UniProtKB/Swiss-Prot annotation:
PROSITE patterns: RIBOSOMAL_L16_1. It comes from Burkholderia ambifaria (strain MC40-6). Binds 23S rRNA and is also seen to make contacts with the A and possibly P site tRNAs. SUPFAM superfamilies: Ribosomal protein L16p/L10e. GO terms for cellular component: cytosolic large ribosomal subunit. GO terms for biological process: translation. The keyword Transferase does not apply. It comes from the Bacteria. Residues 1-13 have a biased composition (Basic residues). Part of the 50S ribosomal subunit. Keywords: Ribonucleoprotein, Ribosomal protein, RNA-binding, rRNA-binding, tRNA-binding. This is Large ribosomal subunit protein uL16.
Amino acid sequence: MLQPKRRKYRKEQKGRNTGKATRGNAVSFGDFGLKAIGRGRLTARQIEAARRAMTRHIKRGGRIWIRIFPDKPISQKPAEVRMGNGKGNPEYYVAEIQPGKMLYEMDGVTEELAREAFRLAAAKLPLKTAFIVRQLGA
């Protein structure tokens, strides 16, 4: 699963996920892309589950690019622990997703195969997504 190798600080504040993606919002590597329409967080497990679903569907052909990386640690306190006594330990990592962000890209497959693979992947994600075809000349 994806997670940072090392961080300057172990814990991070919650913050607010506002605005829309101004970077990473176009199909750059492949011919087809899965773009986020909604806003939210994707955990490393969700990113991996969607990747597996796509990889299984396209079998040997094609290439997949993951355009997002979970670099924000989410901390949790253990069950049945009283409030206070500091912040909990980092449990997992998430990628903050803004509308317009390209999540995955694919190349080397037909459009209908890519469309179906992205449909299977989108079912694993808690966001609304759209299938994007690379524009010629872009």
